[in-house]
């Protein structure tokens, strides 16, 4: 399987090698209905974003703020995950002369108070980078992040509804903060009806709110509800990072369960003081991860839903002081 990582992108708003810029109080759309000959699910459909932010030839792009934006009806390519493609998507691209400019990266990023509705593929993504080769392995040191990754990233008070794929994701960031966000009914296009011509692409997976290759990411006071069924489809996913903490979050009726600890490079992760209400399929997915701590959570569980999702186990975890309550006692 392959990922598409180059091609044409249509962006309603584009910040290219910008610094100390605030985009605020706009309504933004980028639909595909007027493009002759382009079908919704075609494999080579143009990528589209509401707001694209790109770092390339100016080194560290600092001080990007996206605040109080209403972004809707962005009809991107449902298959492509590694390009600017969705409601808000920030990427670092390979510089023309890295020795002269320094690595392309972001620092001091704030995405706050935005409403994203019917956007595809991603809802809100911060930080995909050309420099991913510097983040291999499970244990991650600070040094690669300080040179190639992203610093001081905050994603707060955003609402993502009906994203075609993933809801909210932060990538390649050192100690990012993701708080008070909602992912509602995301992954609504990761199904056989819409995701119908992927070719040899990987990626028929999507989840609610999660990090990729971050160190010490903190997710708190978020809500993920009604994530639609696919190979993942859980509310939260500690994916291939070091030291992710989920605390004081709420999840409800996500069709793939509450939380996944994803694969061999997901280490030192903690899931504590969260509430899961009627998550489906299986409450947790410890998917070949070396370790995880699941402590002091409350799980309201429907009859017949297992704690570990079938065919999503094989990993290691420690469960301490969790409360399990049968859902039938709390529904009319």
Label the predicted regions.
Residues 1-22, 32-62, 80-98, 102-103:
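Extracellular beta-strand-rich solenoid/capping regions of secreted or surface-exposed proteins
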Residues 7, 203-204:
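Extracytoplasmic loops and strand-loop junctions of Gram-negative outer membrane beta-barrel proteins
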Residues 15, 28, 53, 90, ...:
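Extracellular beta-strand solenoids
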